[in-house]
Design a protein with these regions (language model features):
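Phosphate-group recognition and catalysis centered on beta-loop-alpha active-site segments
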Residues: 1-227
Length: 227
């Protein structure tokens, strides 16, 4: 049995609306080791689960999140957009991969980390995004676990790796093969990939020796790795 970590991308979005409590719970019930969530801040600084910068795609309201208070978001979505605190409570002791699409500096990451610490979840949360956001995370927390999202076959510069100090390199799955995985492992890092959703692509990545797969089909991945 291969010990690859199965990470549920935004929960279980093929069955339930992404980044909702029901979706996260469904993914964990279907074999996820961890759930990936996207976080943004409301106007009043409350971290909530939302990938986009507005409510339009998922909730039908063409309103930028940054223009709304947490209470207004709750009202517009019928409580459907969870706060980070809600999500941490719902995922109990499971690992949570926090993607930070809206973070650009330390000022915007600190409210997120404050909630994670207040919920006693710092030891089970890790962070992913590009270099700018991960530099902010590292500046805010020297002990944070980081998966640096990387979109090039060329390795990150040594200076960037020294500044971010990631545990993982997080790649789009199509870039990854045995050779890249071996190179990253030689450099002392783990390989995470996103988001293969077919059995064929997941099998290929398992054979390539990756350490973690983030997918919208965590049930499929769970079945494959158990064979």
């Amino acid at each position: 049995m291969q010990t690859v970590t199965a990470v549920a991308h935004r929960g279980d979005p093929y069955r339930l609306r992404e980044n909702t409590i029901a979706s996260l719970r469904s993914a964990l019930d279907r074999g996820a080791d961890a759930v990936e969530i996207d976080l943004r801040l409301t106007r009043d600084g409350v971290p909530v689960l939302l990938h986009d910068d507005s409510l339009k795609r998922l909730w039908g309201h063409d309103r930028p999140l940054r223009s709304l208070s947490a209470e207004e978001v709750r009202g517009l979505t019928g409580g459907g957009v969870p706060t980070l605190a809600d999500a941490l409570a719902a995922t109990a002791d499971s690992r949570v991969m926090v993607d930070l699409p809206g973070v650009r500096d330390v000022r915007t990451v600190r409210p997120i980390m404050d909630v994670i610490r207040a919920c006693g979840a710092a030891d089970r949360v890790y962070y992913c995004a590009g270099a700018e956001a991960m530099l902010a995370v590292r500046a805010a927390d020297p002990a944070a676990e980081i998966a640096l999202t990387w979109t090039s076959l060329a390795p990150p510069r040594a200076a960037l790796l020294a500044a971010v100090r990631p545990r993982w390199l997080n790649y789009r799955f199509a870039l990854v093969d045995r050779e890249l995985t071996a190179r990253v492992h030689r450099d002392g890092l783990l390989v995470s990939v996103w988001t293969p959703d077919t059995a064929r692509s997941q099998r290929r990545l398992l054979r390539a020796g990756v350490d973690s797969i983030t997918t919208n089909r965590v049930d499929l991945l769970h079945a494959l790795r158990e064979r």
